[in-house]
Amino acid sequence: MNDIKRLAGYIGSYKKDMMLGALMVMIETAFELVIPIMIADLIDVGVANHDLAYIYSKGFQMGICALLALVTGLLYARFAARASYGWGAKIREAEYAKVMQYSFSNLDHFDTSSLITRMTTDVTVLQNLINSGFRPVTRGPSLLILGIGLSFWMNPKLAIVFLVCTPVLGIVLFLIVRKVAPMYTKLQTIVDRLNHVVQEGVTAIRAVKAFVRGEYEEEKFDAVNTDLSVSSEQTFHYAVLNLPAFQVVMYSAIVLIMWFGGNMILSGSLKVGDLTGFLSYVMQVVNALMMIANVFLLLTRSLASAHRIAEVLDERIVLKSPENGVQKVKDGSVDFEQVSFKYHKDAKAYALSDVDLHIKAGQTIGVVGGTGAAKTTLVQLIPRLYDATCGTVRVGGVDVKAYDLHALRAAVGIILQKNELFSGTIRDNLKWGDPDADDEKIWHACRVACADEFLERFPDGLDTMLVQGGNNLSGGQKQRLCIARALLASAKILIFDDSTSAVDTATEKKIRKELAKLGDMTKIIIAQRISSVIHTDRIVILDDGKIHNIGTHEQLLKEDAIYQEIYASQMKGGNSDGIENEEC
């Protein structure tokens, strides 16, 4: 319940709608509770005395009450809808804002599909708590208390028979809720898995088609979908038991009331109209209990969803800007001082171990190594996407932990392995680097990245629309746009994380020549191809998370066995053209 209470704080400006909705429900309930009294009078006075005028009068009054109950019910629906959808929007905004603050290590705690489910399905479950649950939770107790009170007022003896059944219903409700609560949590977890499979399959649909793996993906989806179906069936198998259980108990009570009431009518101590009115109250109380039972089941599922949402909102941000953090990066120098790093504190092995590396401002550094050598891990410590486990990382001579995060990351441009572009125009995507960039600055960055070659062929140029992920561009085109976007940021340090792998060697050479003109910018190039780093001031060889050697291409080619092996394999593998061209 604490999670629900906490999320209730996001209702904010919609409290007025909630209060008005509750008022409408209470007025609606009052009108409905008056009707059984009118029915009793209509039978005992109007019908018994054959008084048509009285019957018409009471019938008209009952119609007015029913109409007013309908109007107040419709008004409630309007207020509840506004409150529930507004509340849901506020929660989604809070979740999304929180996720945008996450560091990479925070994101490691959640699957992307799970975060999507928590912002959509789980929020919808909470919205249903208001849409479907607020009315009965307000109306149910009112009907229950007033119904029992009025039934005692009409006939205390019959009311006692009915009242005895209430604890039995409470026990049934408790047992069902206790059984179903953990099943709802499991159900939402399977929804996460289903979303993950769908997202993965749709995102990689081109690879699925290329490798003719459609049947395999269908089988994988069917397996998870079947799990969801079975889990849903099991959950609702127990959840729906409340209806037959309640019906058995309550209809047994009604039979007893009719038996006792019939005997009382025969003895003359009870009128037919009073018994009819009493039974109307009994049915209203039964409905109230059913409403409360359904609300408890809805609340049970909502508690599971609220807990999942709270996990997102309560996730402790691992990386935060310090108070009064340094706002300006002096230069592009980078220093690693006895740096070690592991992704999880409980991990036995370090991804990086005892790294000592000093890069002067304006230098161009190449980083090579085998798969899993921790090349990407190394550079992710510079803009503080992760914090070093041991040791110190400095940028511009200052510990990265002392910087304001926004200031640090604005000074460090990083072009990731995966080229991320968004739906919208090419211009909009490039302006991520500099929102205020004019066309002249944008085109200059595109020329440096050799993106102007294909942009000039597009009829709409910078206004060309990109689909999600930029999938209407080739891999090389996307890489060049990502490079141009990073250049627009005018960062002091520019990191290329294997970000020219999709362009041909001739284009890569052009890009390097243009980048060489940016002498005041420190450039760190992670690459698989020797030709990508052969021109750099120094080359760092990483092996199993440790610095194996540092030197120029010529030095390493003479002295280092690992570098010689990489060079020889690429000469045999068809990269010799690029390497020879660089050495000419």
Identify the residue ranges that each predicted region occupies.
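Membrane-integrated ABC transporters
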Residues: 1-32, 39, 47-62, 72, ...
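Transmembrane helices of ABC transporter permease
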Residues: 13, 17-30, 41, 65, ...
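An intracellular "coupling" helix at the cytosolic face of ABC transporter transmembrane type-1 domains
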Residues: 13-16, 104-105, 121-130, 134, ...
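Alpha-helical transmembrane segments of multi-pass integral membrane proteins
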Residues: 24-28, 61-69, 73, 81-85, ...
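Hydrophobic/aromatic residues in alpha-helical transmembrane segments
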Residues: 35, 39, 76, 80, ...
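Short intracellular "coupling" helices and adjacent cytoplasmic loop segments at the cytosolic face
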Residues: 49-50, 85, 93-117, 121-123, ...
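Helix-loop-helix
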Residues: 50-57, 146, 150-164, 234-308, ...
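ABC-type nucleotide-binding domain
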Residues: 327-584
